[in-house]
Amino acid sequence: MAASSADKCRPLANFHPSVWGYHFLSYTHEITNQEKVEVDEYKETIRKMLVETCDNSTQKLVLIDAMQRLGVAYHFDNEIETSIQNIFDASSKQNDNDNNLYVVSLRFRLVRQQGHYMSSDVFKQFTNQDGKFKETLTNDVQGLLSLYEASHLRVRNEEILEEALTFTTTHLESIVSNLSNNNNSLKVEVGEALTQPIRMTLPRMGARKYISIYENNDAHHHLLLKFAKLDFNMLQKFHQRELSDLTRWWKDLDFANKYPYARDRLVECYFWILGVYFEPKYSRARKMMTKVLNLTSIIDDTFDAYATFDELVTFNDAIQRWDANAIDSIQPYMRPAYQALLDIYSEMEQVLSKEGKLDRVYYAKNEMKKLVRAYFKETQWLNDCDHIPKYEEQVENAIVSAGYMMISTTCLVGIEEFISHETFEWLMNESVIVRASALIARAMNDIVGHEDEQERGHVASLIECYMKDYGASKQETYIKFLKEVTNAWKDINKQFFRPTEVPMFVLERVLNLTRVADTLYKEKDTYTNAKGKLKNMINSILIESVKI
């Protein structure tokens, strides 16, 4: 029989207060006309350089890679698309650099990143008869690094790329400890790659770090570097202005005082969504999605870290009804959050109805209701004498409660590109890439956070459920889930192969969302414990400008 909620203490988590408060209210700097003109002039020079460089040359590969890693490729999407298509089409023909590990690996990675299937057999020439990579390659640090990055584009059953990852990781770890400070640029680049491979790197974080690495590379193109710095700083001002507007909205709600038990993480939510899309054209969508994510965080903490079961019964019911008249049925302290939730989606409807895109909000509401039902399911298990669900049952619910299915759908609501009903239906039906992304988020979050959650009385995580059902140790369970995460990344990679089921920009949102999970939950839950690593990352991309 279920225990009475009146007999239970509220499961307070004692989250630390906001790191930032209302710091970004004052960031209202406008981008000057002089800045815009200067960036546009550089942009046209770089565009000319990109178009005039021969597609089938190493220089073109290096240039495109630098543009992407410096964070300026979004200015040249069409030109890069055409170039990579030409490079892919020509890849079946003999090339002068086909025995150069650096070039072959770079071409492979760029082509696969763009969604073209290039066979991993291109690496066979670098292996012995036993399938192992030749030891002579260990002297080629740039080649090893290029192969290492390429191996992260692998899909399931690509044994040669599994071998490549093992081989390069072993030797790069040895090399980085032995490189002298005279090779500091290369040492930093290798160290960064081992920590966060390009495929798993958030675009803005990657750009911020690579600008410094590229500047210290003697072979850098000074015009491209200057353009990347100017563009980074201009975008930073743009993002600061957005965050200032959002901070004003958050301050007016006064939720830091109304919900002291919840994580006050507006800036961290903005960083999260900035990871999904940073380009200026996504400004409206970014602001909408940040509001939704911030409210979701409050609702999540209400379920996990404050409300009683009886209070949550009516709260869940009100959200499923999605009706302002339901507000009187819930606890007074819950009403501001409920009203804010209705208001956010109502604002979306007002904006999108003018564009004939009202149906998008229907899909977004459905995903939010589904997420809250998953939260409530966990509450029911916990209320049922701390019932530990079967692992398979918990997996299905936990993938939804991770929130990534909701975000994958809702992040598309405010964007201006055309999105068909079929695309939204595809997302909502737990497509392979969305499910893989949600699994990565849930598994990584549970690995770093399950022990803290259990201390305050949280429903059994995937970790506890697996250990109970399969008699596994904690370490064995961690290994199992890290393997699941690796395989999920392979599934994501495969979904990018053309022809894709949905537009590439939709897949890119899910990829970036997965990168956020990898960044936030790599070693600990930096969203919950936001004072260290995450604070530094936010500082580097939203406060500190790049020195020109």
From Swiss-Prot:
Catalytic activity reported: (2E,6E)-farnesyl diphosphate = germacrene C + diphosphate; (2E)-geranyl diphosphate = terpinolene + diphosphate; (2E)-geranyl diphosphate = limonene + diphosphate; (2E)-geranyl diphosphate = beta-myrcene + diphosphate
Species for this entry: Solanum lycopersicum (Tomato)
Protein name listed in UniProt: Sesquiterpene synthase 9
Class of the enzyme per the UniProt entry, highest EC level: lyase
Stated role: Involved in the biosynthesis of germacrene C, one of the most abundant sesquiterpene in the leaf oil of tomato. Produces mainly germacrene C, but also smaller amounts of germacrene A, B and D when used with farnesyl diphosphate (FPP) as substrate; able to use both (2E,6E)-farnesyl diphosphate ((EE)-FPP) and (2Z,6Z)-farnesyl diphosphate ((ZZ)-FPP). No or low activity with geranylgeranyl diphosphate (GGPP). Can act with a low efficiency as a monoterpene synthase with geranyl diphosphate (GPP) as substrate, thus producing beta-myrcene, limonene and terpinolene.
Tissues and organs where the protein is expressed, per its UniProt entry: Mostly expressed in stem and trichomes, to a lower extent in roots, leaves and flowers and, at low levels, in fruits.
GO annotation, biological process: diterpenoid biosynthetic process; terpenoid biosynthetic process
Note describing how the cofactor binds: Binds 3 Mg(2+) or Mn(2+) ions per subunit.
Binding site for Mg(2+) 2: D300, D304
Keywords, sorted A to Z: Cytoplasm, Lyase, Magnesium, Manganese, Metal-binding
Positions of Mg(2+) 1 binding: D300, D304
Subcellular localization, as worded in the UniProt entry: Cytoplasm
Domain of life: Eukaryota
Family affiliation: Belongs to the terpene synthase family. Tpsa subfamily.
Gene Ontology CC: one annotated term: cytoplasm
EC number of the protein: 4.2.3.15, 4.2.3.60, 4.2.3.-, 4.2.3.113
